Amino acid sequence: MEYAILFATSLVITVLAASGFAPAHGWNKGTATFYGGADASGTMGGACGYGNLYTAGYGTNTAALSSVLFNDGWSCGQCYLIMCDAAATPQWCRAGAAVTITATNLCPPNWALPSNSGGWCNPPRPHFDMAEPAWLQIGIYKAGIIPVLYQQVKCWRQGGIRFTMGGFNFFELVLVSNVAGSGSVRSVSVKGGSTGWITLNRNWGANWQCNSGLVGQALSFAVTSTGGQTLYIYNVVPSWWSFGMTFTSNQQFSY
């Protein structure tokens, strides 16, 4: 039985590597539950600020991360390859299956419950509260919670990096989304048509802020991924922008 499980795990890794999903690091152990309903409608919004995950391009392969993984929002947009740990609970795993999810939300601690009985997202547990359609790709519904093997992998996105202009008056709150490569952002700077480069501070989730009164100016961005790649995206936001508008660049991260 143990040989069969090890063989199945090896087969999954081999197939994933051949399909371009080869992970960069070793497997880690964690657990996973699900939320949001069969259509994942309950996963919209979230602590990363992506809003409607359907229109934002993230779909239903998403998850809320426990605080140890969420890292106060710095992990927003990262991708994780997850498979059920068949060596631990073969009866609750879909044999040979794996899924890649995007971190879009926080699964907060529940201090009223012990971490091994309901407080699944309590530190220091690495836990994924996955959108139900994603979870069902690797687990059997009746189980409710399963042990998993996971690791961070490269993100693949359709189209370029997106910038959504939030805020009001002299306060700009820029949502940076649809990030490929490492998936998450280390730093952002903005340059208006009549300004130099201005460093933005991360406010919450994937939202970056400045107080520079940039309305009426075309905007360029310098974005550095957590993978260490920096892109200069010039004039991606035209001078006629207004709050609430989203603009898609023609550039994308590779790492």
Swiss-Prot record:
Family annotation (SUPFAM superfamilies): Barwin-like endoglucanases (SSF50685), PHL pollen allergen (SSF49590)
Entry membrane topology: Peripheral membrane protein
InterPro entries xrefs: Expan_Lol_pI, Expansin, Expansin/allergen_DPBB_dom, Expansin_CBD, Expansin_CBD_sf, RlpA-like_DPBB, RlpA-like_sf
Domain (Expansin-like CBD): residue spans on this chain: 170-249
Pfam families for this protein: DPBB_1, Expansin_C
Keyword Cell wall biogenesis/degradation: yes
GO biological process, one term: plant-type cell wall loosening
Swiss-Prot/TrEMBL keywords: Cell wall, Cell wall biogenesis/degradation, Membrane, Secreted, Signal
Keyword Metal-binding set for record: no
Span of the signal peptide: 1-26
Record-annotated Expansin-like EG45 domain positions: 45-160
Annotated compartments: Secreted, Cell wall; Membrane
Tissue specificity remark: Expressed in panicles and flowers.
GO cellular component: extracellular region; membrane
Main location (coarse class): secreted
Purpose: May cause loosening and extension of plant cell walls by disrupting non-covalent bonding between cellulose microfibrils and matrix glucans. No enzymatic activity has been found. May be required for rapid internodal elongation in deepwater rice during submergence.
Annotated family: Belongs to the expansin family. Expansin A subfamily.
Protein name: Expansin-A25
